[in-house]
């Protein structure tokens, strides 16, 4: 009875491994319910391998320690494993040992050596030498010489001198130059060439006689500017013969300027003009606003003046002060 309980306990824990993955060092646990008498003794039991070279010798955990030779072969085990339910993920049990050899199509373990030959299509390892010959279509390495090709010989830029060899070199025909640089034009005497500079987006001109270049077109006529008048005009006084400056014009002889000149001797005219910004006194008084006291004083003065005029009409003594009022008094 104890052995059957042990078998049931182990059958719930153990998991099966397909027979296709069984090797000499693998272990099998079965949970079948077949009624064959030959397999009744090994159902639900865990077996361990005895010996390194023994492929078919197993020892049961529930049987005595004495060994026995199993008459079953791998073909019988495969037939048993087909009838047994297999789990999706086969994991080793606690009592089982990890197989030494990895399963097929699995990555190597850390302790296993890395294969020396790389797989096809993989880059070379750091220790491997780099192939000397470059692949077709790749640019040359820095240490390799640049292949010599018939590159187009550019025309001289501005502020550069042209060597005599390049000047006398006629290898580049006009047709090739026109194909490479169709924007080159020569003058009538083939002395000056207008060359297009794509970097500056402008033409520069090459003079073959002086072997110089410039951005200005020498064929264009220079703008004729009127010569400067270097003569000076001098005025002298007709009567005194003194030098007359430019500001001494006939306008200085006007009445206003004469009065200004004479009054400057006694008054500071410039300061008085700047005080009211050149405005007249009448305009200044119109814009002026009087206070209440000033208005009362002005009214009182006007009343006094009217009273004095009324009394002067009837007072004869006032004729001595103002003789012009005598006619009014006589009438």
From Swiss-Prot:
<protein>
    <recommendedName>
        <fullName>WW domain-containing protein C2F3.14c</fullName>
    </recommendedName>
</protein>
<feature type="region of interest" description="Disordered">
    <location>
        <begin position="1"/>
        <end position="184"/>
    </location>
</feature>
<feature type="compositionally biased region" description="Polar residues">
    <location>
        <begin position="158"/>
        <end position="184"/>
    </location>
</feature>
<feature type="compositionally biased region" description="Polar residues">
    <location>
        <begin position="57"/>
        <end position="89"/>
    </location>
</feature>
<feature type="domain" description="WW">
    <location>
        <begin position="187"/>
        <end position="220"/>
    </location>
</feature>
<keyword id="KW-0539">Nucleus</keyword>
<feature type="region of interest" description="Disordered">
    <location>
        <begin position="290"/>
        <end position="309"/>
    </location>
</feature>
<feature type="compositionally biased region" description="Polar residues">
    <location>
        <begin position="9"/>
        <end position="22"/>
    </location>
</feature>
<dbReference type="GO" id="GO:0045292">
    <property type="term" value="P:mRNA cis splicing, via spliceosome"/>
</dbReference>
<dbReference type="GO" id="GO:0005684">
    <property type="term" value="C:U2-type spliceosomal complex"/>
</dbReference>
<feature type="compositionally biased region" description="Pro residues">
    <location>
        <begin position="105"/>
        <end position="145"/>
    </location>
</feature>
<feature type="compositionally biased region" description="Basic and acidic residues">
    <location>
        <begin position="292"/>
        <end position="309"/>
    </location>
</feature>
<feature type="compositionally biased region" description="Low complexity">
    <location>
        <begin position="23"/>
        <end position="41"/>
    </location>
</feature>
<dbReference type="GO" id="GO:0005634">
    <property type="term" value="C:nucleus"/>
</dbReference>
